[in-house]
């Protein structure tokens, strides 16, 4: 990476906020009926003989993942939830897998199945948090969700906290569950790494959309921090590479005790990174405070509704 960028955010724009403000969390039901039905019968590892749309990694699997993501994002967006920025970027990346998959990946079956396994970890963490089952929520996600609910970090912070929890914490376990080989037996690492190129193709437009929807100062903060879309893409790519290595460590563990030790190290790494992100993207450092941000989002939604 040309520069880490993240550590320079603290010196970007010293805008004093008015203190944290609680954000009323939206109610998102625990998965749409079609999603829950599919997940119940989806095998852990993709197989060419599965009759489940994600079990065999068919293109319909990505459609199902995107549909559930969209259903959830629409609820978050309509309430100006601070969880919406992460959900939006995640949705745009997953849409890219479906749109660009045919030309970008050698074998989409594995990635389609992995995307379903991966997404369900986020859905489950969010649903447990909203239901008050906080002990079932990984610590990195607890930090992200609490920061969003209390309105203590910037839009960039909400994005990075979500991406860290999902990539640094969830992805190793999703990879270990799905396996590191395609249904035909070949290593899936090549296509896994090609996702990094997809990230590069959607990051700039996605960050611009985040600014339009949630905080027009996002671009200014990124420029002042010398954190450009390519840096965000490279940061996420680095986390993804670490996650593949962590999945290999999980699968190489010979005993439950060894696996538990690897799992603890994954959790600790994601949690430590979350605390760093939370500190350097505090809206007391980068602004604006939650009240200003919420007012902007609500005005935009009212204008959008009036036009329609």
Predicted regions and their residues:
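C-terminal motif of bacterial Sec signal peptides marking the signal peptidase cleavage site
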Residues: 15-17
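Bacterial signal peptide processing site
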Residues: 19-21
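Acidic, low-complexity proline/glycine-rich segments
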Residues: 25-68
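Long acidic/polar interaction regions in large eukaryotic complex-forming proteins
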Residues: 28-31, 35, 39, 90-183, ...
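Extended amphipathic alpha-helical scaffold segments
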Residues: 64, 68-110
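A contiguous, surface-oriented mixed alpha/beta subdomain in the mid-to-C-terminal portion of proteins
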Residues: 153-267, 277
């Amino acid at each position: 990476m040309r520069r880490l960028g993240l550590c320079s955010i603290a010196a970007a724009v010293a805008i004093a906020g008015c203190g944290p403000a609680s954000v009323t969390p939206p109610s998102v039901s625990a998965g749409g009926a079609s999603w829950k039905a599919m997940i119940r019968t989806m095998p852990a590892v993709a197989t060419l003989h599965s009759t489940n749309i994600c079990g065999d990694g068919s293109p319909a699997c990505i459609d199902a993942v995107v549909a559930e993501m969209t259903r959830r994002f629409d609820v978050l967006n309509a309430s100006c939830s601070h969880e919406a920025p992460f959900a939006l970027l995640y949705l745009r990346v997953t849409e890219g897998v479906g749109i660009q998959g045919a030309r970008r990946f050698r074998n989409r079956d594995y990635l389609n199945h992995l995307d379903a396994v991966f997404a369900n970890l986020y859905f489950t963490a969010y649903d447990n948090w909203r239901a008050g089952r906080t002990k079932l929520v990984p610590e990195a996600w607890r930090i992200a969700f609490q920061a969003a609910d209390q309105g203590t970090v910037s839009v960039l912070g909400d994005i990075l906290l979500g991406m860290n929890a999902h990539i640094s914490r969830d992805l190793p376990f999703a990879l270990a569950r799905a396996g590191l080989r395609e249904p035909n037996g070949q290593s899936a690492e090549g296509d896994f790494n090609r996702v990094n190129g997809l990230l590069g193709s959607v990051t700039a437009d996605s960050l611009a959309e985040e600014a339009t929807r949630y905080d027009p100062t996002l671009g200014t903060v990124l420029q002042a921090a010398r954190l450009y879309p390519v840096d965000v893409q490279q940061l996420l790519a680095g986390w993804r590479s670490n996650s593949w290595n962590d999945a290999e460590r999980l699968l190489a563990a010979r005993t439950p005790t060894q696996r538990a030790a690897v799992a603890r190290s994954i959790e600790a790494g994601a949690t430590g990174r979350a605390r760093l992100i939370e500190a350097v993207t505090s809206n007391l450092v980068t602004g604006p405070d939650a009240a200003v941000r919420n007012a902007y989002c609500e005005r935009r939604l009212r204008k959008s509704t009036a036009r329609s």
